[in-house]
Amino acid sequence: MKKFFISVVFIVLLTFTTFINSATAAKLDDNVRTLPLNEDKEVVLTIKEYTQGKREFTNVCSQCHVGGITKTNPDVSLDPETLALAYPARDNIEGLIDYMQNPTTYDGFIEISEFHPSIKSADIYPEMRNLTEDDLYAIAGYILVQPKVLGKQWGGGKIFR
């Protein structure tokens, strides 16, 4: 009886996992995953990169940026408009990677690596130590896909939840 119960639970979990992954893949078609690489080029994020970005964002970034908001400064979120108005613009993959490597204030004038987790400050923020270039690319891609999936809920704060 115990083996039967374990088998049933395993089959249910396997079916549920397969269904969830299929649903995620269906929502994230090529159009949703097409993102600006920089000011001139676009790229299509793979499902694998999206999944990797989601995992790394959840593990490293979500303690301050859950749902695309910024807990320490709610005026500066990860929504597309806010990212586009930053200087330099952070509404593309290369811009976000640059920020994760060397963060600056919203106007771009002051370096803030000792206050914001980054690759440059990995000695202060150990969660950044093991992130590779591929991880940064995936995180940036995840950040840029989320507004297409969640709309104004991403970075919109309490009012949109």
Curated annotation (Swiss-Prot):
InterPro entries: Cyt_c-like_dom, Cyt_c-like_dom_sf, Cytochrom_C550, PsbV_cyt_c550, PsbV_cyt_c550-like. Binds 1 heme c group covalently per subunit. GO terms for cellular component: photosystem II; plasma membrane-derived thylakoid membrane. It comes from the Bacteria. Residues 1-25 form the signal peptide. Keywords: Electron transport, Heme, Iron, Membrane, Metal-binding, Photosynthesis, Photosystem II, Signal, Thylakoid, Transport. The keyword Thylakoid applies. Its main location: membrane. It is a peripheral membrane protein. GO terms for molecular function: electron transfer activity; heme binding; iron ion binding. The keyword Metal-binding applies. It is found in: Cellular thylakoid membrane. GO terms for biological process: photosynthesis, light reaction; respiratory electron transport chain. Pfam families: Cytochrom_C550. Heme c binds at residues 61, 64-65, 116. Its cofactor is heme c. PSII is composed of 1 copy each of membrane proteins PsbA, PsbB, PsbC, PsbD, PsbE, PsbF, PsbH, PsbI, PsbJ, PsbK, PsbL, PsbM, PsbT, PsbX, PsbY, PsbZ, Psb30/Ycf12, peripheral proteins PsbO, CyanoQ (PsbQ), PsbU, PsbV and a large number of cofactors. It forms dimeric complexes. NCBIfam families: PS_II_C550. One of the extrinsic, lumenal subunits of photosystem II (PSII). PSII is a light-driven water plastoquinone oxidoreductase, using light energy to abstract electrons from H(2)O, generating a proton gradient subsequently used for ATP formation. The extrinsic proteins stabilize the structure of photosystem II oxygen-evolving complex (OEC), the ion environment of oxygen evolution and protect the OEC against heat-induced inactivation. Low-potential cytochrome c that plays a role in the OEC of PSII. Belongs to the cytochrome c family. PsbV subfamily. This is Photosystem II extrinsic protein V.
